């Protein structure tokens, strides 16, 4: 069986990507069913036992900026080795709620960590590995902030300012502009039915 495909969902907190992730994966599995392939759904930080432990630390504990980035990439290395690469080698498709673009957007754009440091970590951990497709849920920070307002106990990222998320969004859009062949941008300011129509277009193009 041919190697599988790797799809990532990205966007600032409150963009709505997680709301649509399982719906997208269910539709993708329907398309892949006759081929015998499976859809593996995962997330970052997380995806492995170590990754989920790191997730709790990363989302809730204050820390030095470079420590934060190093922990993100440590979890990613484990995620690649134990989940993503084995699934792709089996011919399965993997859909991840966040991957490396999030680190460039949050730790780079949002927190200001120099891009060259992140690029060095990316080369070390991933080599040339990149997603086959990244679905970017794009929304104005003010809209995302209103959505996040419904979260009872926000983590340290969800608690960031609109200015932080404006920088994060700008970095996402910069990366999408630099790799248009890899990105599909979804206008997530629209209603759920409208967003799902956009996602149907993404699925049809696979």
Curated annotation (Swiss-Prot):
A cellular component term, taken from the record's GO annotations: cytosol
Catalytic activity: dTMP + ATP = dTDP + ADP
GO biological-process terms attached to the record: dTDP biosynthetic process; dTTP biosynthetic process; dUDP biosynthetic process
InterPro entries on file: P-loop_NTPase, Thymidylate_kin-like_dom, Thymidylate_kinase
Enzyme class: transferase
Domain of life: Bacteria
HAMAP family reported for this sequence: Thymidylate_kinase (MF_00165)
Family (UniProt): Belongs to the thymidylate kinase family.
Protein name as catalogued: Thymidylate kinase
């Amino acid at each position: 069986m041919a190697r599988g495909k790797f799809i990532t969902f990205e966007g600032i907190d409150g963009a709505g990507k997680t709301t649509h992730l399982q719906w997208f994966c269910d539709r993708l599995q329907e398309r892949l069913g006759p081929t015998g392939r499976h859809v593996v759904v995962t997330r970052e930080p997380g995806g492995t036992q170590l990754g989920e432990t790191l997730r709790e630390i990363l989302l809730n504990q204050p820390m030095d900026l470079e420590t934060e980035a190093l922990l993100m990439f440590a979890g990613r290395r484990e995620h690649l080795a134990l989940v993503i690469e084995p699934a792709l080698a089996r011919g399965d498709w993997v859909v991840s709620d966040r991957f490396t673009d999030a680190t460039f957007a949050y730790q780079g754009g949002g927190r200001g960590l120099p891009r060259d440091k992140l690029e060095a970590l990316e080369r070390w951990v991933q080599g040339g590995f990149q997603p086959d497709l990244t679905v970017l849920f794009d929304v104005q920070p003010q809209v995302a902030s209103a959505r996040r307002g419904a979260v009872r106990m926000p983590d340290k990222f969800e608690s960031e300012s609109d200015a932080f998320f404006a920088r994060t969004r700008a970095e996402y859009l910069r990366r999408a502009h630099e790799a248009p062949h890899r990105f599909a941008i979804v206008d997530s300011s629209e209603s759920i039915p409208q967003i799902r129509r956009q996602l149907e277009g993404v699925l049809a193009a696979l």
